[in-house]
């Protein structure tokens, strides 16, 4: 009879074990989505012409370094970075829209608020160390929640 009781107990998982397995499944799903989004983003960057491709590659590194919690994805066919599924910042190539400059933009999810008016997009013709530093600081500020309600 003792064997039957032991077998009955071992047939199922405890609540704690089930919760841990559910958490792990969610982690694996999130990792897979992040990997898929990054693959799609890198494929879009590879399709760009120079100098947009070089700027987009560098921006990808800057954004990942400044806000590793953001998830790379594509948004309207352009590189974008999201938090909790919502786009925070993005890159628009000059060639796609036949513009004289590329654009680095931020959505309303970005915490860039400064008083009653602030910029949400920036023209980008060249990416030097000065612009890299500015963009890195903007991305860090964009993902901070200090000022957001």
Where are these regions (language model features)?
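Charge-dense, helix-prone N-terminal extensions
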Residues: 1-149
């Amino acid at each position: 009879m003792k064997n039957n009781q032991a077998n009955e107990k071992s047939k199922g998982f405890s609540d704690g074990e089930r919760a841990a397995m559910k958490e792990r499944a969610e982690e694996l799903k999130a990792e897979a989505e992040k990997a898929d989004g990054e693959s799609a983003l890198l494929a879009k960057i590879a399709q760009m012409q120079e100098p947009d491709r070089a700027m987009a590659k560098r921006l990808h590194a800057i954004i990942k370094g400044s806000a590793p919690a953001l998830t790379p994805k594509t948004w309207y066919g352009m590189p974008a970075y999201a938090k909790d599924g919502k786009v925070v910042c993005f890159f628009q190539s000059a060639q796609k829209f036949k513009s004289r400059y590329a654009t680095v933009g931020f959505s309303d999810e970005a915490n860039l608020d400064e008083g009653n008016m602030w910029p949400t997009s920036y023209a980008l013709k060249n990416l030097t160390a000065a612009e890299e530093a500015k963009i890195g600081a903007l991305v860090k500020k964009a993902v901070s929640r200090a000022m957001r309600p």
